[in-house]
From Swiss-Prot:
Complex and partners: Homodimer.
Protein family: Belongs to the LDH/MDH superfamily. MDH type 1 family.
Gene3D superfamilies in the record: NAD(P)-binding Rossmann-like Domain
SUPFAM superfamilies: NAD(P)-binding Rossmann-fold domains
Full protein name: Malate dehydrogenase
E.C. number(s) listed in UniProt: 1.1.1.37
Catalytic activity, as annotated: (S)-malate + NAD(+) = oxaloacetate + NADH + H(+)
PANTHER family: MALATE AND LACTATE DEHYDROGENASE, MALATE DEHYDROGENASE, MITOCHONDRIAL
Length: 114
């Protein structure tokens, strides 16, 4: 599955589905990631904004931390057994936020968060 809050995501999924493989891709958009998470064994979070000129790491953190927190809360409810990879910057803090969210939900497994 491919998920983003942007409404173009289903179209991107259709484009990706033209790659000649047996993999089926579905696109989901909107505030609720639950439909995209159903059945997922691995979730890769690459959400958030990229660092712009004049933006320091704390500015980046202030934007991306909330996005990661929200997504991980949805993962904890929908697919608590999934492995979660986070590449959202600043990674050293967004992974820590994800760990705390998972601990609060009672589903933290250090071997499944990277």
């Amino acid at each position: 599955s491919l998920y983003d809050i942007a409404p173009v995501t289903p179209g991107v999924a259709v484009d990706l589905s033209h790659i000649p493989t047996d993999v089926k891709i579905k696109g989901f958009s909107g505030e609720d990631a639950t439909p995209a998470l159903e059945g997922a064994d691995v979730v890769l979070i690459s959400a958030g904004v990229a660092r712009k000129p004049g933006m320091d790491r704390s500015d980046l953190f202030n934007v991306n931390a909330g996005i990661v927190k929200n997504l991980v809360q949805q993962i904890a409810k929908t697919r608590p057994q999934a492995c979660i990879g986070i590449i959202t910057n600043p990674v050293n803090t967004t992974v820590a936020i994800a760990a705390e969210v998972l601990k609060k939900a009672g589903v933290y497994d250090k071997n499944k968060l990277f």
